Amino acid sequence: MSVKWEKQEGNEGVLTVEVDAETFNKALDDAFKKVVKQVSIPGFRKGKVPRGLFEQRFGVESLYQDALDILLPVEYPKAIDEAGIDPVDRPEIDVEKIEKGESLIFTAKVTVKPEVKLGDYKGLNVEKDDATVTDEDVQEELKGMQNRQAELVVKEEGAIENGDTVVLDFEGFVDGEAFEGGKAENYSLEVGSGSFIPGFEEQLVGLEAGAEKDVEVTFPEEYHAEDLAGKPAVFKVKIHEIKAKELPALDDEFAKDVDEEVETLAELTEKTKKRLEEAKENEAEGKLREELVEKASENAEVDIPQAMVDTELDRMMKEFEQRLQMQGMNLELYFQFSGQDEDALKEQMKEDAAKRVKSNLTLEAIAAAENLQVSDEEVEEELSKMAEAYNMPIENIKQAIGSTEAMKEDLKVRKAIDFLVENR
C-alpha cells in the first residue's frame, strides 16, 4: 500500500491510496465466494458456478462493489494510520482506478481534527467558591425534611392560605368557549406551588370551603398550546375541601423516622451537616473546574469543523432524549408541548455544542503540551470503579466497552482539567 496525504483549505484534505494488485485480487476472490452463493445458471447447482463462467456471463465488474465493501473497511483505517491523520467525519470515497489484476487506487476526501493554538492556561485567575455550611443551612434542610413528612389535615373552618392543599373543580373558558384540557373535578392543588398559570393560585387565597369564584388569568406568551398563548381566560372554580400541613415535631422520633441509621436528632443534624458540606464542596469544585476550562478555551484559537459540531449536536440530542425518558416523556411529546421541532431545538443547542467541542479540543491540546499520560493501571482502576458502580464483574465491563482507547482519552482530558486546577 502507498499513501499520499494532501492538506487543503481549512481542516480538509485528500488521501490518495494505492492498494497492491494481490490484495485487490484477494478481495475479488472473497467477493466471488459471497456472490456465487446466490447465483443459479442452468446445468450448475446454486453456488457451484465456475468463476470463469460467472465472469463470462456477468462480467468481472459485477464483483467490484462487493470487493470494495470488503476492502475499504480494512484498507482505509490502515491508510489514515500511515498518513498520521485524525479524521472527524466519514470520508468521501472516489475510486480512481479499478481493474482485475491491477492495483486499486482510491481517494478519500477527509475532514481532520484541527490544530489548536493554545493561549494562557496556567495561572488562570479563578477563585473557588466558599463551601462553608452554616447552622442556618442545616436548619433549613431539616425544615425541608419536616415539611416532606407533614400530614395533610382537613381544615374544618378557615380560609385558604399559601401552602394549603385544596380539592377543587375548575373549568376554563377563552372568549366564552370552553377549551380542551381546561376542566377537572376534585383536583388537588397545593396553593403557592406554581403548578398553575401565573395568577391562578394567588386568587384562591382567602376563599373558604364551598366557595365559588371566577378566576381571571392570562396565558403566558410562551405557553405550549399556541391557540391559548397570550390569551385572557376565565376559570370557574368551586372549592370542596381545604387541607393544611401538620408538621411533625423535630425530635428524636422524627430523626429515626427519616433516617433509620440515626437514633437522635443530634445525630441527624450532624449527618445532615456532613452531607451538605460534601454537596457544597462538590458543587464548588465542579464550578471551579468548569470556569477554568471555559477560560482556557476562550484563550485558545481553533477553527472548528462543522462535522464535529454536528456530531456533538447528535450526542446532545441523545442525552436530552434520555433525560426526557427518565421523566416519562419522549421527543414527540416534548415538541408537542414546547411548540418546537427538531431543527429549532438543534439551533438552540448549536452554540453550546460548539463550546463543548472547543473545550474538549483545548483540553486535548493541553494534555499533549504537558505530556499527560494515562497508564494501564489507571484504566484498570477506572474499570474497577465502573464495575462497582454497576454491580457487575469487571470482565463484563471490559467486554461491553471493547477497546479502552476512548476511556484513555477521557481520562487524559480529566487529567488536563486537574492540571488547570493545580496550576491556577
UniProtKB/Swiss-Prot annotation:
Coiled coil segments of this chain: none
Residue ranges crossing the lipid bilayer per the database entry: none
SUPFAM superfamilies in the cross-refs: FKBP-like, Triger factor/SurA peptide-binding domain-like, Trigger factor ribosome-binding domain
GO annotations of cellular component type: cytoplasm
EC class (word): isomerase
GO molecular function list: peptidyl-prolyl cis-trans isomerase activity; protein folding chaperone; ribosome binding
Major place of residence: cytoplasm
Alphabetical list of InterPro entries matching this protein: PPIase_dom_sf, PPIase_FKBP_dom, Trig_fac, Trigger_fac_C, Trigger_fac_C_sf, Trigger_fac_ribosome-bd_bac, Trigger_fac_ribosome-bd_sf, Trigger_fact/SurA_dom_sf
Keyword S-adenosyl-L-methionine applies: no
Protein keywords: Cell cycle, Cell division, Chaperone, Cytoplasm, Isomerase, Rotamase
Source domain of life: Bacteria
EC code(s) of this entry: 5.2.1.8
Subcellular compartments: Cytoplasm
Catalysis performed (reactions): [protein]-peptidylproline (omega=180) = [protein]-peptidylproline (omega=0)
Domain PPIase FKBP-type per the UniProt entry, residue ranges: 163-248
Cell cycle keyword on record: yes
GO biological process: one example: protein unfolding
Gene3D superfamilies: 3.10.50.40, Trigger factor ribosome-binding domain (3.30.70.1050), Trigger factor, C-terminal domain (1.10.3120.10)
Record's function text: Involved in protein export. Acts as a chaperone by maintaining the newly synthesized protein in an open conformation. Functions as a peptidyl-prolyl cis-trans isomerase.
Notes on the domains: Consists of 3 domains; the N-terminus binds the ribosome, the middle domain has PPIase activity, while the C-terminus has intrinsic chaperone activity on its own.
Family label: Belongs to the FKBP-type PPIase family. Tig subfamily.
Protein name per Swiss-Prot or TrEMBL: Trigger factor
Biological source species: Bacillus pumilus (strain SAFR-032)
Lineage: Bacteria, Bacillati, Bacillota, Bacilli, Bacillales
